[in-house]
């Protein structure tokens, strides 16, 4: 939640801005840390800017080893996506970053909620996202990541073709799909192509939960090309596609 800050909030913690973002974790270990501290805590994200967000303790070590004093490992995250950011300094309140708390859920609590138009399209000089985490290609793997949108089997056939081409040329290549669509690739992709299912289309929270881990796993195997399917934008799917679109640098091919 973004509020106008009072004088008790140091500007060092807000990047010099007159607003402050307040967030509350739902993990019992994080809540225990806050309770023991007995003070307000400045809590930047536990990853380097531009890297996929951490969902495991080892991801934090990969990014922050030698940069911080301690890591408290609470196990795998419960949701897999960063928090929804909502600006309550404006009327009506505005979503600056979609997350697991969806617009539909917010509307059950407050009548009107808008979405920052800049997060729906590729950033331009005249339309830039207000939230720092929404900048161009922020949630990005090292590989050239392309997504394909269209009828499922048609998309799979195109991905099989381009993935096999890249693999035959000697590139380390990966594919992102779902449990329901994984069968399209079985026996049709080269042995060197790594096919990863993000989860169950009927349970989009499973896709959200595995998204960043999959991107980091591709980084570890030094993938040079990743080809992925798009997903429904319904409910939490909006946040999933927001992260994937940015990870792909808005490189979505419509079939």
Predicted regions and their residues:
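Active-site-adjacent structural elements in enzyme catalytic cores
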Residues: 1-255
């Amino acid at each position: 939640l973004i509020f106008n800050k009072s004088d008790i909030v140091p500007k060092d913690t807000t990047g010099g801005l007159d607003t402050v973002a307040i967030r509350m974790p739902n993990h019992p270990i994080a809540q225990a840390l806050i309770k023991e501290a007995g003070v307000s805590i400045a809590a930047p994200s536990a990853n380097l800017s531009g890297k996929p967000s951490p969902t495991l303790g080892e991801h934090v070590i990969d990014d922050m080893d030698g940069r911080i004093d301690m890591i408290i490992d609470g196990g795998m995250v419960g949701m897999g996506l960063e928090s929804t950011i909502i600006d309550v300094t404006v009327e009506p309140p505005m979503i600056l970053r979609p997350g697991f708390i969806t617009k539909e859920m917010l509307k059950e609590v407050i009548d009107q909620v808008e979405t920052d138009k800049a997060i729906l399209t590729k950033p331009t000089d005249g339309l830039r996202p207000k939230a720092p985490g929404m900048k161009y290609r922020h949630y990005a793997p090292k590989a050239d990541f392309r997504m394909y949108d269209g009828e499922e089997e048609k998309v799979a056939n195109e991905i099989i073709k381009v993935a096999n081409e890249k693999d035959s040329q000697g590139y380390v290549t990966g594919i992102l799909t779902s449990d329901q669509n994984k069968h399209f690739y079985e026996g049709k992709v080269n042995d060197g192509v790594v096919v990863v299912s993000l989860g169950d289309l009927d349970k989009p929270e499973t896709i959200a939960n595995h998204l960043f881990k999959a991107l980091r796993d591709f980084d570890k195997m030094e993938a040079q090309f990743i080809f992925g399917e798009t997903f429904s934008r319904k409910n939490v799917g909006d946040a999933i596609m927001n992260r994937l679109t940015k990870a792909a640098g808005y490189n979505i091919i419509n079939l």
